[in-house]
């Protein structure tokens, strides 16, 4: 169905705070990045709509952390969101050039095409917004009195709004609203309601996955390989760090950060596996913020991001090529440190060391080279369902 007067905005800029907090030991992946086969949930949700409707524009919002990464994956336009849903919507509306807009949360991934068709029919000239709703089955009590449950509506998305009215409703940036209908209602605009569906209930807490598991395929078992290499020359009178461990040495490494060549190579390998660029893009040496930065922090930030977008580490294999210092006395401590940062068993981290038999810059004891290789895969959220309460 062609909708050349309607744009689609998919809200995907949230941090999944409630979702991750509801099972913090298990879920470090944001809900919009849960994989369904090969695709993240935000892409599944968007394609569920674009499969049935041809919108003039399709726009997704992404958090500042995810923005560049999502751009590299998305076949649709991606705009950077704000700190709140309202701010993200304001940013997206700047790019809309149609009179109508359909706004949906990617956490409501299973939108009904028949309900949307009903919404389109319900949008007459007097209506600024059409929303789907479901009722409540339980007796409801609020602030000292029982409510008439037949009058209670639980509002869902997607919501169909007139762009001009919605922009006016969101003009005051000091006000925050949880959805489009509440913003338009506060402006005195007329809202129309159509019957929604329990299938469009929002995925908010990790326990909600139980209701979705039969309709969402498990993640692909594909393995992703990443390689990283880094070299640093020695610098006298500087502390030496390798693999997160302080090394007894008369010199350290010449670098903008602390120069931990092991953690730098490992960070690049992780970024390579997930298609996340390189460590120089994340922590540029032109930024004084990272002057003498702790490479353990850098690795932790990169891996936390990798988990947040749906990946987990299977194993890491690290080769340290050095004439000096001697690596053997520190290998065990390095493994423990790296495993702790990456939240994996020590057995998943392997560290090897070799010399160049006196050849090259390493043999001349001018510096150290490290190569790292990692294997990673999608977090299999299906296996965690049994642990949910």
Curated annotation (Swiss-Prot):
InterPro entries: IspD/F, IspD/TarI, ISPD_synthase_CS, MECDP_synthase, MECDP_synthase_CS, MECDP_synthase_sf, Nucleotide-diphossugar_trans
Site residues (Transition state stabilizer), renumbered to this chain: 18, 31, 256, 355
Pfam families tied to this protein: IspD, YgbB
Reactions listed under catalytic activity: 2-C-methyl-D-erythritol 4-phosphate + CTP + H(+) = 4-CDP-2-C-methyl-D-erythritol + diphosphate; 4-CDP-2-C-methyl-D-erythritol 2-phosphate = 2-C-methyl-D-erythritol 2,4-cyclic diphosphate + CMP
Enzyme Commission number: 2.7.7.60, 4.6.1.12
Chain positions covered by the region annotation 2-C-methyl-D-erythritol 4-phosphate cytidylyltransferase: 1-223
Cofactor: a divalent metal cation
Chain residues that bind a divalent metal cation: 230, 232, 264
UniProt KW Transferase keyword: yes
GO biological process per UniProt: isopentenyl diphosphate biosynthetic process, methylerythritol 4-phosphate pathway; terpenoid biosynthetic process
Region of interest (2-C-methyl-D-erythritol 2,4-cyclodiphosphate synthase), residue spans: 224-389
Assigned keywords, A-Z: Isoprene biosynthesis, Lyase, Metal-binding, Multifunctional enzyme, Nucleotidyltransferase, Transferase
Domain of life: Bacteria
GO molecular function, one term: metal ion binding
Site (Positions MEP for the nucleophilic attack): 149, 202
Entry binding sites for 4-CDP-2-C-methyl-D-erythritol 2-phosphate: 230-232, 256-257, 278-280, 283-287, 354-357, 361, 364
Pathway where it operates: Isoprenoid biosynthesis; isopentenyl diphosphate biosynthesis via DXP pathway; isopentenyl diphosphate from 1-deoxy-D-xylulose 5-phosphate: step 2/6; Isoprenoid biosynthesis; isopentenyl diphosphate biosynthesis via DXP pathway; isopentenyl diphosphate from 1-deoxy-D-xylulose 5-phosphate: step 4/6
Family, similarity comment: In the N-terminal section; belongs to the IspD/TarI cytidylyltransferase family. IspD subfamily.
UniProt function note: Bifunctional enzyme that catalyzes the formation of 4-diphosphocytidyl-2-C-methyl-D-erythritol from CTP and 2-C-methyl-D-erythritol 4-phosphate (MEP) (IspD), and catalyzes the conversion of 4-diphosphocytidyl-2-C-methyl-D-erythritol 2-phosphate (CDP-ME2P) to 2-C-methyl-D-erythritol 2,4-cyclodiphosphate (ME-CPP) with a corresponding release of cytidine 5-monophosphate (CMP) (IspF).
Protein name: Bifunctional enzyme IspD/IspF
Species of provenance: Helicobacter hepaticus (strain ATCC 51449 / 3B1)
């Amino acid at each position: 169905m062609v909708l050349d007067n309607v744009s689609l905005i998919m809200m995907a800029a949230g941090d999944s705070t409630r979702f991750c907090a509801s099972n913090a030991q298990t879920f470090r992946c944001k809900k919009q990045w849960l994989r369904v086969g090969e695709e993240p949930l935000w892409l599944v949700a968007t394609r569920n709509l674009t499969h049935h409707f041809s919108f003039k524009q399709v726009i997704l919002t992404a958090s500042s952390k995810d923005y560049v990464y999502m751009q590299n994956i998305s076949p649709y336009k991606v705009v950077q969101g704000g700190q709140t849903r309202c701010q993200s919507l304001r940013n997206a509306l700047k790019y809309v050039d149609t009179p109508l807009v359909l706004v949906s949360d990617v956490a409501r991934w299973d939108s009904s095409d028949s309900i949307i068709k009903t919404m389109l029919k319900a949008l007459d000239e007097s209506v600024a917004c059409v929303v789907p709703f479901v009722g409540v089955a339980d007796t409801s009590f609020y602030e000292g009195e029982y409510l008439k449950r037949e009058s209670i509506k639980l509002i869902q998305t997607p919501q169909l709004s007139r762009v001009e009215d919605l922009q006016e409703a969101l003009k005051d940036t000091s006000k925050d609203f949880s959805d489009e209908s509440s913003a338009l209602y506060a402006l005195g605009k007329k809202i129309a309601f159509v019957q929604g569906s329990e299938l469009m209930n929002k995925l908010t807490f990790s326990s909600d996955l139980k209701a979705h598991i039969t309709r969402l395929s498990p993640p692909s078992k594909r393995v992703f390989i990443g390689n990283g290499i880094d070299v640093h020359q020695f610098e006298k009178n500087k502390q030496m760090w390798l693999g997160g461990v302080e090394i007894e040495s008369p010199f350290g490494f010449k670098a903008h950060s602390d120069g931990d060549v092991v953690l730098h190579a490992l960070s690049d390998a992780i970024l390579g596996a997930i298609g996340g660029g390189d460590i120089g893009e994340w922590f540029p040496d032109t930024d004084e913020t990272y002057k003498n930065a702790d490479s353990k922090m850098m690795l932790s930030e990169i891996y936390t991001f990798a988990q947040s977008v749906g990946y987990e580490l299977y194993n890491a294999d690290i080769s340290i090529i050095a004439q000096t210092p001697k690596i053997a006395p520190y290998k065990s401590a390095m493994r423990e440190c790296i495993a702790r940062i990456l939240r994996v068993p020590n057995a998943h981290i392997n560290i090897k060391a070799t010399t160049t038999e006196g050849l090259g810059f390493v043999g001349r004891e001018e510096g150290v080279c490290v190569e790292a290789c990692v294997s990673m895969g999608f977090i299999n959220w299906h296996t965690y369902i049994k642990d949910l309460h």
